[in-house]
């Protein structure tokens, strides 16, 4: 006989079914008093690292700061209470941190794949949720919107019955409870829910790729060869042309992916299929935002000799030649400024930078060039 229990991993649907006049429950998920209980703070991660360093379980040349720098973009940035945002440190996912540390301590090196395979069960849940009934189109739009913008505005719902699971607010709330979204601020009386980190972002892109490949199959061998040529030889044209051709050929979902923002989502999903690079969309350089920075993953692949910044420009199908010429000129000026940025230069790790401008009109690539010469 239990007088009091604490239950973890409870969804809003389960909570709705459990609570009644006979079962009194308190949902502490978004209670700011418990925000830091649901993960590791950076200080706690550093304590863990120092413990293993002092025990001699981590190599001397692997520093505390280098480990934090490695895992922060992949496992950090969770916030579970609106009142805690901006006031308390963001939280690391404890499972993901332990996955990394298990490799580092047990095998002597960081995992080659930074995506924690344990979190991929959430991806399976995501697919099942989307296809649960005949109204999946609206939920697909939500997933696309989140993947392409990196956030969505909504109100979180603490509990609801199963029959209302697929309503907009409830569906978005489920994504939050499954760890696919976290609190990133407020907009009026709504929350700005964001993709917390690269580990989760890749799960969204994997869903998009599954959807795209159901329409237009992905030749993995050809794509691998194209990434090899781009990373090792600096021959980027096969890679960019492959992705642009796939964008053109995916005719059945043209209405869904038309537009510059959706083009970026499509490009991002394909670029994440390599481990040679860490893909950084919308990174700030010289007070502007570069569409893509292909940051060499030098810690794992020191043989990579070439890095890339991409500027995507989209024109509607009825745009004039004058529109295209003006847009191209602006893109060239933009990417030259980005390429000269000191912060960007410091991140190249000795690789040769290739600034690439891609101009799409409708569904067709009309101009693809490297600015400043090269292949």
Spell out what each predicted region is.
Residues 12-20, 28-102:
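Amphipathic alpha-helical segments of the small helical/lid subdomains adjacent to P-loop NTPase cores
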Residues 1-3:
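Substrate-engagement module of ASCE P-loop NTPases
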Residues 343-375:
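Domain-level recognition of nuclease-like catalytic cores that cleave nucleotide substrates
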Residues 11-15, 315, 362:
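Short, solvent-exposed loop/turn segments at secondary-structure junctions
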Residues 16-21, 366-370:
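A short acidic (Asp/Glu
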Residues 6, 308-310, 354-358:
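Hydrophobic/aromatic beta-strand patches that form the interior of the parallel beta-sheet core
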Residues 6-10, 17, 185-187:
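Glycine-rich, histidine-containing beta strand-loop boundary motifs that form or position
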Residues 25, 90-333, 337-339, 368-375:
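Extended alpha-helical interface modules used as scaffolds for assembling large macromolecular complexes
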């Amino acid at each position: 006989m239990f007088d009091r229990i604490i239950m973890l991993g409870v969804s809003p649907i389960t909570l709705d079914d459990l609570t009644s006049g006979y079962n009194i429950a308190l949902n502490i998920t978004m209670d700011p008093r418990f925000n830091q209980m649901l993960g590791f703070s950076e200080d706690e991660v550093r304590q863990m690292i120092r413990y293993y360093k002092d025990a001699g379980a981590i190599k001397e040349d692997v520093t505390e700061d280098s480990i934090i720098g490695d895992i922060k973009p992949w496992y950090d940035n969770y916030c579970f209470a609106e009142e805690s945002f901006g006031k308390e440190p963001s939280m690391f996912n404890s499972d993901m941190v332990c996955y990394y540390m298990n490799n580092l301590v047990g095998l002597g090196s960081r995992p080659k794949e930074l995506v924690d395979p344990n979190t991929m069960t959430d991806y399976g849940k995501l697919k099942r949720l989307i296809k649960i009934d005949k109204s999946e189109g609206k939920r697909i739009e939500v997933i696309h919107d989140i993947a392409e913008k990196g956030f969505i505005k909504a109100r979180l719902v603490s509990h609801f019955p199963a029959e209302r699971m697929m309503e907009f607010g409830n569906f978005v709330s489920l994504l939050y409870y499954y760890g696919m979204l976290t609190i990133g601020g407020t907009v009026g009386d709504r929350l700005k829910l964001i993709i917390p980190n690269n580990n989760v972002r890749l799960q969204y892109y994997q869903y998009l790729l599954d959807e795209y490949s159901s329409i237009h199959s992905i030749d993995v061998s050809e794509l691998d060869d194209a990434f090899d040529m781009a990373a090792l030889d600096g021959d980027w044209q096969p890679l960019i042309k492959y992705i642009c051709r796939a964008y053109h050929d995916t005719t059945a979902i043209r209405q869904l992916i038309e537009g510059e923002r959706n083009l970026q989502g499509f490009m991002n999903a394909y670029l994440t299929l390599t481990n040679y690079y860490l893909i950084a969309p919308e990174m700030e350089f010289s007070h502007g935002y570069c569409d893509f920075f292909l940051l060499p993953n030098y810690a794992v692949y020191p043989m990579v000799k070439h890095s890339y910044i991409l500027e995507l420009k989209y024109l509607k199908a009825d745009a004039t030649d004058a529109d295209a010429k003006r847009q191209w000129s602006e893109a060239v000026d933009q990417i030259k400024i980005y390429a000269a940025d000191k912060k960007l230069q410091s991140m190249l790790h000795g690789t040769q930078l290739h600034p690439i401008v891609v101009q799409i009109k409708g569904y067709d690539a009309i101009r693809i060039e490297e600015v400043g010469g090269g292949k």
